Swiss-Prot record:
GO molecular function: calcium ion binding; extracellular matrix structural constituent
The keyword RNA-binding is annotated on this UniProt entry: no
Observed phenotype of the null mutant: Reduces fertility. In larvae results in impaired climbing abilities and in multiple holes in the basal membrane surrounding the fat body adipose, the somatic muscles and the longitudinal and circular visceral muscles, affecting permeability and mechanical stability of the basement membrane. Impairs larvae movement including reduced crawling speed, smaller stride frequency and exploration area together with sudden motion defects in their crawling pattern, such as head shaking, and spontaneous rolling and bending.
Keyword list, A-Z: Basement membrane, Calcium, Cell adhesion, Disulfide bond, EGF-like domain, Extracellular matrix, Glycoprotein, Repeat, Secreted, Signal
GO cellular component: a single term: basement membrane
Name recorded for this polypeptide: Nidogen
Species assigned in the record: Drosophila melanogaster
PROSITE patterns: ASX_HYDROXYL, EGF_2, EGF_3, EGF_CA, LDLRB, NIDO, NIDOGEN_G2
Span of domain Nidogen G2 beta-barrel: 325-550
């Protein structure tokens, strides 16, 4: 990296070759062009100093107007952040490239912060008419511009930023720079001065939040949008503004900025004698070292120079990136695919994990048709992986060759005849260090379905250097489409063009070939997100047989072995070693001290001696044996030992110089490793005479042997005579399934993650110890899944009830379920616990859940000012002495009171009476008078927001200016078009800064029952039960065959089943006074309301399995209607005058939806297809039929007293949506179409119709006078009525029909109560943004119940 001294030397050398005539050399010296203008004490006018801070501004009212471009200005603002603006205040730093929205002059526009600077730091502005300054400025202009030989300056305005730091309050590096406006009545010139050594930082620090700051920008912006920037502006080369020049003096720049014609821009000096560069140094490091990246070195060559990235960085020298740092790629798409234009709204976003060569790319928004076909545009998949491929053997990847600036041209030819051209232009890093690309697509690809799964197997592509700066590749590929049982064959031709720079010591790469491996390819279109998601891993420099363990890319520590694993590798510690983190946080393999940990198997009469990677056992004095079994000497003397086997150590009682009891074991292992076949252990390898003759001789067996009937036999995986057993497998291996297999990395305890309450949790696969201090490994972790997913710290792919946390022992971010939930972090299920940390609702509303360390759990504790056990808290005395009451107050019998002439304000403080009402207004707020209420109040000033009592703060800039939305979010206008806010894109939820992927059945198939499928609907992705099953999708039950084609009729005290042919009528249940009823065709049950017992009950169609449904807070349920799709039961209570609803699956979830302007509600009907509810009201003065949405909103009058008299029961015709009703006053059965309000009469001149239903194109109704079930077809022709026997009273009330057809549709409320909380009931409302509303239930206490109806 070039040092300050080398830079200074380069500058001196550069200045030495500037050839100017003696006349002009003397002239430049006399002009003191590189010296800062200073305000001298006693000078005319005054100097303005900016306050310390990071967004300050002051205004200078100009004595003489100044011209800039084609405009004239009288005010000039100076801003902390290195910029001057005309007539407009511009205090905030905007992280966006030029042009800005203001007419401005930027000397060094950057995130300046002087909040904690010392006295040596200042930002000043002064206007001078001192003759010495005017003469100096005039001479400079006359010298630089040949047309200004008569120029005389009338004023010089100077702004200086001296020793300023950068955001956030950093002062370790300081910048100094100046801008001078030199003007007369018509012309204006701007001089920038950057002193030698004055530029030491380029951008502020954002602490990883949002986009990084753009590097300093220098230039001009006109009011009409024209702009001009200096060389290096907004890039790393901005640091050379103090060394470059357009005038001949390093660090000094001069421009003419007025007058400028409409089609022109600012002008640079034109004096030909000002600078002449030496041809010898035109292409040398002395002249152009600053063209290299700051982390690169410049190398001269015979002709020209090359830039080479330094250690720890990679690139082409002009652009260098830090090793292993993730990078983002952003791009746009244009063109035409399959004769359809590619949406220019579609944006490409890639996230590259460079340390792994893994790329994740998203393109959205895309229509399903376009997204499905774009999956076949393979260059979208392969180009970014080529750039950032993992290098093998030092082979350069794409970024090392190009620095991110190149052209990629592709042609795809499909076997089916289609041709496609793709041109990609990579423009290098943008202002925010994101790689920018423009993509053009023209041609056709084969048609594939959006839901078809495309499989592209791993493949190796070959690139050939045609010449330096040009690569070519031709590859034949096959894409498998399993659902369609077809294979798409295609040929991909690629050509890459870039500017190459070969050092003299580098060979010409022409005709050489490089192999790149593409693996783990994903080609998915997600319709919910309107997004194409593609991903891949890539390595460059591979061979067809290479893997990470043999190509040199693996990096394993000592005492570990490299094991190829899928497309990467893992490092497993040798047996006897365990993985631990050293003081640097690096995982190393350290010896396990089995003797200290107690994991050895030595005899209790033996001494354990730890060794590197193992341990030895030695019998203590007075005992003999192999250390794993030791007997006293007296016992051992009576035992006959078999002859010693060669290589077997004699039993000892003291450690020998070579303490290993198996001296040949290492040699045996070496021989065994050389064998191609693993030897199979022989359980009886030795002659019969070696079998022990005494049962106690089993103690002589090896620790790796068992004793069978007095015979020592080595364990599986060991070889020997039973007395000495050697391990067949080497270090890091284990005998399994008849061969040696690599030993997986041992799992060790990890630290738990604990919250502020002390509640701790463990990652998936670990269990919290009883003392909550450690997480112990209990089951295998699905590492493969983690490897295939985008890291959770990148894509926020954890479950909604999980967080993404770093676990140092695992060296990765892991999704961890939150307290109260259990799972792998991608799926978290609630667990039951009596702790308030799990169930905070058990605490009193005036209590907090606090973790008590001595109890080891959380408990409820009353808040300050309350007493009790935490479950029940009562108000405590407010005070016991004046000390408890604060300033200007005293304690009066347990109550704090204000002193005389003081009164309480809204923040409960005692303040002097008067002022603004009874309070003092905070900063940036004023006192206003509300004439309507007759009171004073504090309000924030315009441009400020917040609490006017405690102080108002300036309104922050919105995201369309700051560009600070998070990943998976966009900046969208609010209802006020002037304001913007960050909003998560479809499929994600959050505050727009952190967006978490919503859990759905596509990314979590376990949400669906095994008898359900994940379907895309207008409501999003939902689980839908398969044909023949019913349920909410997460639980599906097989539909039982139900009897059909019969009526169920209420006779008051009896419920009767009436076949449509009128025969075999039979009672199915007894009631006291059942009026309205309806059926649930899904479960084969009939529900009715009993106005005498004040209940709603149900039975099966045959009368069995009687169950209560609603038994409390119900008076007179005269009408019953069931929505079988959303699983809701509605009823009309004529005593309470309400319309209510409850969940069929959980009747405790019930709500009142209408309770206003009802007199005598009777009949009720639901249309689940069109999502409408209808009811009749027997109000004698104003009878009516009304309708509403299913949640009670949108209430409308359908029919009034002019159309109905005594409307009883209602029925909705499924096909047409008509509402039909029986009117005992008009003695008609009529129907009305709710949309156009057209009425048609089905039958008239009736007696007293009450209940009504419809099936098989026929209407059925009960008649109180004829005491029959009357029938008429849809054309109005009367049919033979049914005369059922009467089992109860002689009146028939409500009725319903059981048909074979039972609807099976989706509803937003089907699954998990539609996502509503336990205190709310989900009800369908398509007019709501989510397609549903969450109604407060009748039993909820912490839910604000809005007045239903109107």
């Amino acid at each position: 990296m070039p040092t300050f001294g080398s830079k200074l030397l380069a500058c001196l050398l550069l200045s030495s070759v500037i050839l100017v005539s003696g006349q002009f050399e003397h002239y430049l010296d006399s002009l003191r062009a590189s010296e800062l203008y200073e305000f001298e004490d006693g000078s005319l006018g005054s100097i303005h100093l900016l306050p310390k801070g990071d967004s300050e501004t002051i205004v200078l009212q100009l004595e003489q107007p100044i011209h800039f471009y084609g405009e004239q200005y009288e005010q000039l603002y100076i801003n902390t952040n290195g910029i001057l603006t005309f007539n407009s205040e511009f205090p905030e730093y905007l992280n966006q490239p030029f042009p800005l929205e203001y007419a401005s002059i930027a000397a060094f526009y950057s995130n300046v912060d002087t909040s904690f600077s010392d006295e040596g730091t200042s930002i000043s502005l002064f206007e001078s008419k001192e003759q010495s300054i005017l003469d100096r400025a005039s001479s400079l202009v006359r010298y630089a511009f040949s047309s200004q030989s008569e120029f005389e300056a009338r004023q010089v305005i100077v702004a200086t930023w001296r020793n300023v730091g950068y955001f956030d309050s950093k002062t370790d590096r300081l910048n100094t720079f100046q801008v001078a406006l030199i003007a007369n009545e018509q012309s204006t010139f701007v001089q920038f001065i950057y002193p030698d050594g004055g530029l030491n930082w380029l951008q502020g620090e954002t602490a990883g939040l949002g986009l990084p700051d753009i590097r300093a920008q220098a230039g001009f912006v006109a009011e009409d949008g024209r702009f001009y920037t200096l060389n290096g502006s907004g890039s790393e080369n901005a640091r050379f503004l103090s060394e470059s020049t357009n005038l001949g003096v390093p660090g000094v720049w001069l421009f003419e900025v007025a007058p400028i014609e409409n089609e022109q821009n600012v002008r640079s000096p034109d004096n030909a004698e000002s600078l002449t560069e030496s041809p010898a140094l035109a292409l040398s490091c002395q002249a152009h070292a600053h063209q290299c990246h700051e982390k690169a070195e410049c190398h001269d060559k015979a002709e020209g120079y090359c830039c080479v990235c330094g250690s720890g960085f990679y690139g082409n020298g002009k652009s260098c990136l830090a090793n292993d740092q993730p990078i983002r790629v952003t791009g746009t798409l244009t063109g035409e695919l399959n004769k359809q234009p590619v949406s220019e709204e579609a944006k490409l976003q890639s996230y590259v994990v460079t340390s792994e060569g893994r790329t994740y790319t998203t393109i959205n928004p895309l229509t399903p048709e376009l997204g499905a076909q774009l999956r076949l545009v393979l260059p979208l998949l392969t180009t970014v992986p080529w750039l950032f491929a993992k290098s093998v053997g030092g082979v350069a990847n794409g970024y090392q060759l190009t620095g991110g600036v190149y052209t990629h041209v592709s042609r795809l030819q499909f076997d089916s005849g289609e041709n496609l051209h793709v041109n990609q232009t990579f423009e290098g890093l943008n202002y925010w260090d994101q790689l920018s690309v423009k993509i053009e697509i023209y041609g056709e690809v084969p048609a594939v379905a959006a839901d078809a799964v495309l499989i592209l197997p791993d493949y190796v592509e070959e690139y050939t250097f045609e010449r330096p700066g040009e690569l070519k590749s031709v590859q034949v590929l096959n894409i498998n489409i399993t659902e369609e049982q077809r294979v798409l064959g295609l040929q991909v031709e690629q050509r890459i063009l870039y500017r190459s720079c070969l050092r003299d010591d580098e060979a010409d790469p022409s005709a050489t070939k490089v192999l790149q491996k593409i693996s783990k390819v994903a080609l998915d279109y997600v319709e919910r997100d309107q997004a194409l998601r593609i991903g891949a891993m890539s390595k460059v420099g591979v061979t067809p047989e290479s893997n990470a363990c043999n190509d040199g890319t693996a990096d394993c520590v000592e005492n570990s072995v490299c094991v190829p694993y899928e497309d990467t590798y893992r490092c497993d510690c040798y047996h006897g070693f365990a993985a631990q983190l050293d003081e640097r946080g690096v995982e190393v393999c350290l010896d396990i001290d089995e003797c200290a940990t107690g994991s050895h198997v030595c005899d209790e009469n033996a001494v354990c001696d730890n060794t590197e990677g193992g341990f030895n056992c030695y019998c203590t004095e007075g005992f003999e044996g192999n250390g794993y079994r030791c007997l006293s000497n007296s016992t051992a003397d009576n035992i006959e030992y078999p002859p010693a086997v060669e290589g077997q150590a004699e039993p000892t009682s003291e450690p020998s110089p070579n303490p290993s009891p198996y001296p040949d074991q290492g040699q045996d292992q070496e021989r065994e490793r050389e064998d191609d076949q693993y030897p199979q252990p022989n359980p009886y390898p030795y002659p019969e005479e070696q079998i022990p003759q005494h049962p106690d001789e089993c103690y002589r067996c090896s620790k790796d042997a068992d004793c069978y009937q007095g015979r020592c036999t080595c364990h599986e995986g060991f070889d020997g005579d039973g007395y000495t057993c050697t391990n067949i497998c080497g270090h890091g291996e284990v005998w399994e399934n008849g061969r040696c297999e690599p030993l997986l990395l041992e799992r060790h305890d990890v630290d738990p993650l604990c919250d502020a309450l002390g509640e701790c949790r463990c990652p998936y696969g670990y269990e919290l110890s009883e003392d909550s201090q450690r997480c112990t490994y209990v089951q295998e972790f699905d590492g493969e899944r983690n490897a295939d997913l985008i890291p959770c710290d990148v894509d926020e792919n954890c479950h909604i009830n999980a967080t993404c946390n770093w676990y140092g022992q695992e060296l990765r971010h892991i999704c961890t379920c939150q307290p109260g939930f259990r799972g792998d972090g991608y799926n978290c299920d609630p667990i039951s616990d009596d702790s308030c940390a799990i169930r905070p609702d058990i605490c009193d509303v005036h209590a907090d859940c606090v973790y008590e360390e001595h109890l080891g759990k959380s408990e409820c504790q009353c808040q300050a000012g309350y007493t009790g056990n935490g479950f029940n808290c009562q108000l405590a005395a407010e005070c016991q002495s004046a000390e408890h009451c604060g300033e200007n107050a005293f304690c009066d019998d347990g109550v704090c009171r204000c002193q005389a002439d003081f009164e309480r304000d809204v923040s409960d403080r005692c303040v002097p009476a008067g002022r603004c009402g009874s309070v003092f207004c905070g900063s940036n707020a004023i006192c206003k008078w509300d004439s309507a209420e007759g009171v004073q109040y504090c309000d924030c000033l315009d441009g400020y927001q917040g609490d006017a009592l405690t102080g108002c703060t300036s309104k922050p800039l919105s995201c369309h200016v700051l560009n600070n939305c998070g990943i998976h979010a966009t900046c969208e206008p609010t209802e006020d078009p002037a304001n913007y806010e960050c909003q998560c894109i479809a499929g994600f939820k959050g505050d727009g800064y952190v967006c978490i992927e919503e859990q759905n059945c596509l990314n979590n198939p376990t949400l669906c029952d095994m008898n359900a499928q994940c379907r895309s609907t207008n409501s999003g992705l939902v689980c839908v039960c398969n044909q023949g099953f019913f349920g909410n999708g997460s639980l599906c039950q097989e539909r039982q065959h139900q009897d059909s084609d019969f009526l169920i009729v209420s006779q008051g005290v009896m419920i009767a089943r009436v076949p449509l042919n009128g025969r075999n009528v039979r009672p199915i249940s007894v009631a006291q006074m059942a009026i309205g009823l309806d059926k649930d065709c899904v479960e084969g049950r009939v529900y009715w309301g009993d106005i005498s017992t004040k209940k709603i009950v149900s039975t099966k169609y045959d009368g069995t399995d009687l169950r209560p449904f609603i038994t409390t807070d119900i008076e007179s349920p005269e009408g019953i209607a069931i929505d079988v799709i959303s699983r809701r039961l509605y009823w009309a209570d004529s005593a309470k005058d309400t319309i209510e609803v409850a969940s069929l699956d959980d009747p405790s979830l019930r709500a009142v939806i209408i309770n206003k302007q009802l007199v005598n509600p009777r009949g009720i009907a639901v249309d689940p297809y069109r999502e409408k509810l209808f009811w009749s009201d027997w109000d004698r003065e104003s009878p009516k039929i009304e309708m509403s949405n299913l949640d009670g909103t949108g209430r409308e009058l359908l029919l009034g007293k002019d159309d109905v008299t005594l409307p009883n029961s209602l029925v909705v015709l499924e096909n047409s949506g008509e509402v039909c009703y029986a009117d005992a006053g008009t003695k008609k059965v009529e129907c009305i179409e709710p949309q156009n309000r057209q009425i048609r009469t089905i039958s008239n001149e009736l007696s007293y119709p009450f209940g009504i239903t419809f099936t098989h194109d026929q209407f059925y109704w009960t008649d109180w006078t004829t005491k029959k079930v009357e029938i008429v077809d849809s054309l109005g022709a009367r049919q033979t009525p049914i005369q059922p026997p009467f089992f109860g009273s002689h009146k028939m009330y409500g009725m319903t029909v059981v048909e074979q057809h039972c609807p099976q549709y989706q509803s937003p409320c089907q699954i998990s109560n539609g996502g509503c909380t336990d205190s709310r009931l989900c009800l369908v409302n398509r007019q709501a943004p989510s397609g549903k509303s969450c109604k407060c239930t009748s039993a909820s206490t912490g839910c604000t119940v809005l007045a239903p109806g109107y």
